[in-house]
């Protein structure tokens, strides 16, 4: 799952990473869009996971993919305890469980006015109240530092990942 701008800027490296995953015998999907809200991403992941012939096992979020800022779920965290009345950026939990745990139900609240990638969602009591992801997920999101090109960070990281996957690291070959 990648935003259009990040894909345009790091197409060669993203395609090389995709090929390295496929070389391990795994199928891949490439979901590219100008993501404005998290719901369409979650819906597509659920559809791909429900495919009986080739169910989705996991996903990687690359670049500027919306971040679900979960509210009303402090009981699911191990160490994060804060009054929900505090500033929402501080009292919400950024969590990709929004995308990978399909038994959790959420109600969309709003998009953050300052950080547009933040989308506040409330954990609904109608869904499960424990975490058991259906797929695995990871996120490749560059840090924002003045003078550093975030797309170069993505390119550099993916080059390292592909190089590591091509090395014969015996720890990756467990039997």
Spell out what each predicted region is.
Residues 1-175:
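Cysteine-dependent hydrolase recognition
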């Amino acid at each position: 799952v990648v935003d259009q701008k990040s894909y345009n800027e790091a197409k060669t490296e993203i395609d090389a990473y995709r090929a390295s995953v496929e070389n391990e015998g795994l199928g891949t999907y490439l979901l590219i869009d100008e993501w404005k809200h998290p719901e369409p991403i979650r819906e597509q992941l659920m559809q791909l996971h429900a495919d009986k012939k080739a169910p989705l096992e996991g996903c990687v979020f690359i670049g500027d993919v919306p971040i679900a800022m979960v509210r009303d779920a402090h009981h699911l965290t191990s160490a994060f305890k804060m009054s929900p009345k505090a500033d929402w950026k501080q009292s919400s939990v950024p969590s990709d469980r929004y995308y990978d745990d399909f038994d959790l139900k959420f109600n969309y609240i709003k998009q953050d006015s300052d950080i547009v990638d933040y989308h506040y969602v409330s954990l609904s009591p109608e869904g499960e109240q424990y975490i058991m992801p259906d797929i695995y997920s990871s996120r490749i999101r560059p840090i924002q530092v003045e003078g550093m090109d975030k797309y170069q960070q993505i390119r550099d990281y993916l080059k390292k990942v592909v190089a590591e996957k091509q090395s014969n690291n015996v720890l990756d070959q467990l039997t």
